[in-house]
């Protein structure tokens, strides 16, 4: 019974992210993070390695099919528009408003959030929540391939020469290009879904602790944290609920709404962390603050927006049954 309870907690993204943030903040503010052992270079390498393993495993569950742009162009365009363009607007505007202040370095983290693709877990969440799984799978592959160009472009456009672009391109190829290739080698390997979910959540826990636990929050005025919180709330809660209200009003069914909301509001913070730790460490202040809000957003989606009762009611109204 206890092992079942433990597995339930380990497979809960909301619980593991919340636990990771609590442990990371306690470690940070209590001065317990072993920074003398886990220096910046080692943290960067560990973050990149962990993320490569995570993305390789998660992408190996995504089939390379239904990718014909002539047949599925509308679906691909929707994923690109919502998952890349719309999802990037608020953090980019936030950075532009802050780039000429004394906290420009910390605000640079918003650029990495903007450049980051949506989370790889959009597909499994779409399956669980009766979203459009085919669209989620297709969109994930397309977005991650385009991210090989999109991430360097956005970072170059916003941060220019302040970032080593050659190192950025190499890091992006390591983070996303390598998993895209390696994942095909594992595509036919049978992996227990619960064990995979628990392992990926443990990786997320480690990455959040490693990055947030080491982030230097001291010396920053209270108002900059408030600004980062507001930007994060608008980017997750604001965009997510806006997509829900807009699409429901124009008659789009539950399945498409679920996946569209996830693509728009649920960023892959692991990629943002890995890039920022490797290229622009001061920007971790903005990312750490954003993670705290995104954890709350995940819990809200799980318990309210995509609750089982609401899902059953919506699908019943659309003439579908919940098995």
Ranges and model annotations:
Residues 1-323:
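Alpha-helical transmembrane segments of multi-pass small-molecule/ion transporters
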């Amino acid at each position: 019974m206890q092992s079942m309870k433990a597995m339930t907690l380990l497979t809960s993204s909301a619980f593991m992210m919340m636990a990771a943030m609590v442990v990371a903040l306690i470690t940070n503010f209590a001065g317990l993070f072993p920074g003398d052992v886990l220096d910046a270079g080692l943290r960067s390498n560990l973050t990149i390695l962990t993320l490569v393993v995570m993305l390789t495993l998660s992408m190996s569950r995504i089939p390379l099919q239904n990718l014909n742009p002539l047949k599925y162009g509308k679906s691909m365009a929707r994923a690109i528009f919502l998952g890349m363009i719309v999802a990037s607007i608020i953090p980019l505007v936030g950075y532009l408003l802050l780039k000429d202040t004394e906290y420009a370095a910390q605000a640079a983290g918003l650029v990495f959030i903007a450049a980051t693709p949506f989370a790889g877990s959009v597909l499994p969440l779409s399956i669980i929540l009766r979203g459009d799984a085919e669209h989620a799978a297709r969109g994930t592959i397309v977005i991650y391939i385009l991210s090989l160009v999109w991430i360097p472009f956005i970072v170059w456009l916003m941060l220019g020469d302040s970032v080593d672009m050659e190192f950025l391109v190499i890091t992006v190829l390591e983070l996303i290009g390598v998993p895209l290739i390696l994942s095909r080698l594992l595509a036919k390997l049978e992996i227990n879904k619960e064990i995979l979910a628990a392992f990926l959540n443990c990786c997320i826990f480690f990455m959040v602790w490693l990055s947030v636990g080491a982030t230097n929050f001291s010396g920053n005025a209270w108002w900059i944290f408030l600004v980062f919180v507001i930007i994060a709330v608008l980017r997750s809660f604001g965009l997510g609920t806006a997509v829900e209200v807009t699409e429901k009003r124009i008659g789009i069914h539950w399945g498409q709404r679920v996946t569209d909301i996830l693509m728009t509001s649920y960023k892959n913070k692991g990629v943002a962390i890995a890039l920022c730790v490797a290229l622009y460490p001061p920007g971790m202040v903005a990312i750490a603050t954003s993670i705290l809000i995104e954890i709350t957003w995940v819990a809200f989606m799980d318990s309210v927006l995509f609750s089982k009762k609401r899902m059953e009611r919506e699908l019943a109204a659309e003439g579908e049954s919940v098995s």
